Amino acid sequence: RQMCIRDRGIYIKYDLPQVYHPVSRKPLKPHYLLDRNIAILKLFPGISPQVVESILNIPGLKGVVMETFGSGNAPCEEWFLNMLKEAVDRGIVIVNVTQCRAGSVEMHRYETGHKLLEAGVTSGFDSTTESAVTKLMFLFGHGLTPDEVKEHMNCSLIGEVSIPETFRP
């Protein structure tokens, strides 16, 4: 899949031939049912248990977009994986996206990805952080359960994510 955005930063340069054009010319229908109980957990070398715990224990939190390294790698320390699992067990949906400017999360590629899957983390594939946050806000805003949200995170609603053929049910 080619990227629609050629370059991003303060200014966005679009690769216009790649921009999604809907088949229908219906008027824009904004969605206002958004749940803002979402957080971003940006991983960095040496992240402490206190930082992770403070984010995962935000009152009312429903979803976390976790920015990982490379193709979805994260620390493998027991405290970290336990905190993620405990949050998932409480019904918090954790979505794994890459911090890289391009690329995709491949949780089956490395041992760290397998451990995240075991903890209940959901792949964001090639979603951007912003796209994953918005999608979580939309899905929770429409009253979906955590399991339903996870299921919808594994499919493209409007072209916001590329799901590998090998992953599709």
Give a label for each model feature:
Residues 68-169:
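C-terminal non-catalytic interaction/assembly regions of soluble proteins
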Residues 2, 6-71, 76-77, 155-169:
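Accessory alpha-helical/coil subdomains and C-terminal extensions
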